[in-house]
Amino acid sequence: MKLPRKIEKIYIASDHAGFRLKSFIIKEYLGKKKCNFVDLGTNSDKSVDYPKFAKTLCKNINKSSMGILICGSGIGVSISANRHKHIRASLCHNAQTAKMTRKHNDSNVICLKGRPFVKKNIFAML
């Protein structure tokens, strides 16, 4: 049986549509749990292109790290991230899909939708 790898760092990034959810996750989850994380932007709700932030996050992911990507629907960042050879990004909508993709696909990047902004069940997916 393959043992789960130790995660030493979490990278998080979003476009403008995911900025509010990203800020919430950082403040209410990553910060409170004292996770070792790096915020790769964006830093406002000013319009930006999600592929740029997905690419930046993917370049940082290695065997001891994981990523969280957020855009309006989660679909765009998922497609962008999966263009990178070493990335297995999964769009998740609830705790069950997050758990199953981690277990069965060894996903190293979770993709979330920022619109509409919903706090419910977010932490169960992380």
Regions found by a protein language model. Give the residues of each.
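Short helix-loop-beta junction
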Residues: 27-36, 86
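C-terminal binding/interaction regions
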Residues: 3, 11-18, 95-126
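Short active-site oxyanion
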Residues: 9-10, 64-67, 86-88
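Glycine-rich phosphate/diphosphate-binding loop of Rossmann-like nucleotide-binding domains
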Residues: 12-30
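Short, structured active-site "lid" loops
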Residues: 52-73
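A short beta-strand-loop structural module common to alpha/beta enzyme folds
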Residues: 36-47
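Mid-chain, well-packed structural core segment of small domains
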Residues: 69-115
